[in-house]
Amino acid sequence: MVLKFSVSILWIQLAWVSTQLLEQSPQFLSIQEGENLTVYCNSSSVFSSLQWYRQEPGEGPVLLVTVVTGGEVKKLKRLTFQFGDARKDSSLHITAAQTGDTGLYLCAG
């Protein structure tokens, strides 16, 4: 079975002073059930924290995790989230993807 994953680029408003761009890659991904996947989120700016969300079709985004400390790694079942040491990047790794993992994954800072 082919699973489809989507990631999105979010514009983030920090206070009301400037707009930061978070870039996620890949933007779209189709994999076979049981395969692993990694989604990356990068910025030129330092974030005090970073959040990952998952959105199912027709639903609002649901917070999966917040990472705060540079180098921090958090696990949620088969999902592993890592916040880069410099707090400018993060990754989401899904081990042995299942049909229930299908959705839109978003990072926000």
From Swiss-Prot:
Location of this chain's protein in the cell: Cell membrane
PANTHER family per UniProt: T CELL RECEPTOR ALPHA VARIABLE 22, T CELL RECEPTOR ALPHA VARIABLE 39
SMART domains xref list: IGv
Keywords, comma-separated and alphabetical: Adaptive immunity, Cell membrane, Disulfide bond, Glycoprotein, Immunity, Immunoglobulin domain, Membrane, Receptor, Signal, T cell receptor
Residues of the Ig-like domain: 20-109
Stretch forming the signal peptide: 1-19
Cysteine disulfide links: 41-107
GO biological process: adaptive immune response; defense response to Gram-positive bacterium; immune response; response to bacterium
Domain of life the protein comes from: Eukaryota
Entry-linked Pfam families: V-set
InterPro entries on file: Ig-like_dom, Ig-like_dom_sf, Ig-like_fold, Ig_V-set, TCR_alpha_variable
One term under GO cellular component: alpha-beta T cell receptor complex
Protein's job: V region of the variable domain of T cell receptor (TR) alpha chain that participates in the antigen recognition. Alpha-beta T cell receptors are antigen specific receptors which are essential to the immune response and are present on the cell surface of T lymphocytes. Recognize peptide-major histocompatibility (MH) (pMH) complexes that are displayed by antigen presenting cells (APC), a prerequisite for efficient T cell adaptive immunity against pathogens.
Entry coiled-coil feature ranges: none
Glycosylation-annotated residues: 36, 42
Subunit structure, interactors included: Alpha-beta TR is a heterodimer composed of an alpha and beta chain; disulfide-linked. The alpha-beta TR is associated with the transmembrane signaling CD3 coreceptor proteins to form the TR-CD3 (TcR or TCR). The assembly of alpha-beta TR heterodimers with CD3 occurs in the endoplasmic reticulum where a single alpha-beta TR heterodimer associates with one CD3D-CD3E heterodimer, one CD3G-CD3E heterodimer and one CD247 homodimer forming a stable octameric structure. CD3D-CD3E and CD3G-CD3E heterodimers preferentially associate with TR alpha and TR beta chains, respectively.
Organism: Homo sapiens
Protein name: T cell receptor alpha variable 27
